[in-house]
Structures are given as structure tokens and as C-alpha cells.
């Protein structure tokens, strides 16, 4: 990575996870960087490539990129069309404490070990992701009792779905 210039740490996570649903035409392009937390990127529309540890991935709608903490990456955004994506920053320690037997963050470690960070869901998996995201976004807008617990549970369900999509180690 030295040939790419300096690599910086970006973003801070002060909660268990942070969910972004973004749509714009500018797309904030950054130089190579890493985070202290795990990150998932789900492309909904637009054109973007991600370089992760010197491997370039062309994202298609409904593909998911798993980026483990300390992994160097950069987005290359085509700014000629709207870029809609979901980005989730995750505190792996929280999820490990919440459900240690579920190993919810293993999908990031398996993707990192295999060097295959891009998940391409089949039709059934895509429907499950769509339903999970819709339920999570509805829960985000819900002010009633238990809404926070519902959001946490739905985020865990999304991590379970992603874990099912990552191929098992040989």
C-alpha cells in the first residue's frame, strides 16, 4: 500500500453499530483508509468499485462488501449517476458479547481470510436481505417501547444472513 500514498484511520464508532442509508450523486470519495470497526457496504444503485487490500471489486446492486477492521480500502465512485448504498459500522465486541455462541462477526473474519470480501446473494438471499433491511428501517422510525431492542435484534438477524452467505472455510 505504500505506493498508494499514506493510509489514514477514518471514522469513529461510539455506539454498538451505526447504520447509514445514503443516496447522492457526489459520493464522498476518500483516499485509502481503514477503520477500528467492521464495515459492511450494500450497494442499492449506482456504479462503484472498491479496492480492498489491493483487490478491486466491481459492486453491482445488492452485492455486499464485508470489510474487517484494520483492512485498507477505498471506494472509486462513478459520479455520473446516483449512488445509493447502505453502510453499517459495527462494533464486533458488542456482538460477540451479546451472542457469543452465534459468532455473528465470523463472516468478516472468513471473508478476510479467504480474500473474498464481496458477497453476491442469490434471489432468495436478496429477498431476505430486502426484508431484513425494510424491517430494520421501519424499526429505526419506531418510537415505541422496545424499538431499540427490536433494532438490535434485526441487526443481529442481518449479520446471521450475511454469515450464511459467506462460504465456509475449506
Predicted regions mapped to residue ranges:
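Generic protein-terminus/edge-of-domain signal
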Residues: 1-64, 71, 101-107, 113-117
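Residues immediately flanking
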Residues: 45, 69, 90-92
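Polybasic "coupling" helices that flank or enter modular domains
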Residues: 153-158, 168-170
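Short beta-strand His + acidic residue motifs that chelate non-heme Fe in jelly-roll/DSBH
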Residues: 49-51, 67, 73-80, 96
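All-alpha amphipathic helical-bundle segments outside canonical DNA-binding/catalytic cores
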Residues: 124, 140-156
Amino acid at each position: 500500500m505504500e505506493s498508494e500514498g499514506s493510509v489514514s484511520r477514518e471514522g469513529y464508532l461510539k455506539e454498538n453499530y451505526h447504520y447509514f442509508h445514503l443516496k447522492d450523486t457526489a459520493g464522498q470519495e476518500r483516499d485509502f483508509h481503514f477503520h477500528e470497526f467492521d464495515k459492511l457496504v450494500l450497494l442499492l444503485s449506482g456504479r462503484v468499485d472498491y479496492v480492498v487490500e489491493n483487490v478491486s471489486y466491481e459492486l453491482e446492486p445488492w452485492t455486499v462488501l464485508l470489510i474487517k477492521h484494520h483492512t485498507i480500502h477505498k471506494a472509486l465512485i462513478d459520479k455520473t449517476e446516483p449512488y445509493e448504498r447502505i453502510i453499517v459500522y459495527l462494533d464486533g465486541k458488542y456482538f460477540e458479547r451479546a451472542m457469543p455462541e452465534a459468532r455473528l462477526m465470523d463472516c468478516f473474519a472468513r471473508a478476510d481470510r479467504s480474500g473474498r470480501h464481496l458477497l453476491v446473494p442469490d434471489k432468495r438471499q436478496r429477498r431476505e436481505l430486502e426484508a431484513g433491511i425494510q424491517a430494520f428501517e421501519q424499526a429505526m422510525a419506531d418510537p415505541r417501547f422496545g424499538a431499540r431492542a427490536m433494532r438490535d435484534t434485526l441487526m443481529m438477524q442481518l449479520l446471521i444472513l450475511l454469515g450464511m452467505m459467506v462460504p465456509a472455510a475449506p
